[in-house]
Amino acid sequence: MNFEYIINSLLETIKTYNFFVDWEKIENNIKKIEKRLHILNYLIGKENFKEEFFELLKEYPEVITVFPILIAVRDNKITILNENMELETLEFKEKKYLTDEEIERYYKFFKETGLEDLLKNRKIKNLVDYVFGVEVGMDTNARKNRIGDLMENIVKKYIENLCKQNKNLDYIFQATKDKIKQKWGINLTLDKTNRKFDFAVFNKNTKKLYLIEVNFYSGGGSKLKATAGEYRSLNEFIKNNNNNVQFIWITDGKGWNTAKNPLKESFNSGVVILNLKMVKEGLLKEILTQ
């Protein structure tokens, strides 16, 4: 293995078509609140908005639970600084009854956040469609987490297929010390009691255990240096405190171009580092089956 080869064959992205929006999650979120949004649709275009708002909340107090999502907030409690420089907290938990004073506060929320103008002046036609759009926008915040999941899934499919092809190999996804002991009877010594590995692969023929971590970095940052340092120490610990156990780090992404030195230090210290191209070319298979 050559360090320059690792750097020169890093991927720009691992995004797939289903990376951008998690439609299933959004549809499920909408389904939970759809009826209440339809109730609120009644307020669209109402001239005497405040009066209608009061009547609606008297009859259907449960609709307050969907107010936060109308301004792209997931919390059921919102605290703001009012005009008197005092903190004001509104709760949006389900209630069976609302007093006039409470409804007045919710009306103020509607008015001050611009929701009254949105509905009264027919700037939207349907709150279900509107919230669907809000959910799509909010879902983009989850993309960072999805990159990590994507990397795991790519490697998981590869390891799954490898284990099907080679009956001597077995694996655990999200492996802990206890899961490894339970499945293969191996007593691991680890640096942290709660240490979890993305994968553990056991070769029944050689009785060797492989502990695998995977990640992808499209951009730079201090996280890369910290990760390289952590895995360098982890590899050393595993090597010094266990027999027939090897740590493998599968990482990729152009972010490593901004942190070549920490990665090289880990490589030079003996950490087995692979990127996805190397996995595709069979290097992981070679290590696990040798």
Swiss-Prot record:
GO MF annotation, one = DNA binding
List the catalytic activities from the record.
Answer: Endonucleolytic cleavage of DNA to give specific double-stranded fragments with terminal 5'-phosphates
Name one matching Pfam family: DpnII
Species: Methanocaldococcus jannaschii (strain ATCC 43067 / DSM 2661 / JAL-1 / JCM 10045 / NBRC 100440) (Methanococcus jannaschii)
Q: Supply the source organism's classification.
A: Archaea, Methanobacteriati, Methanobacteriota, Methanomada group, Methanococci
Family (UniProt): Belongs to the DpnII type II restriction endonuclease family.
Name of the protein in its database record: Type II restriction enzyme MjaIII
List keywords of the entry alphabetically. Answer: DNA-binding, Endonuclease, Hydrolase, Nuclease, Restriction system
- Which cysteines share a disulfide bond? none
Function comment? A P subtype restriction enzyme that recognizes the double-stranded sequence 5'-GATC-3'; the cleavage site is unknown.
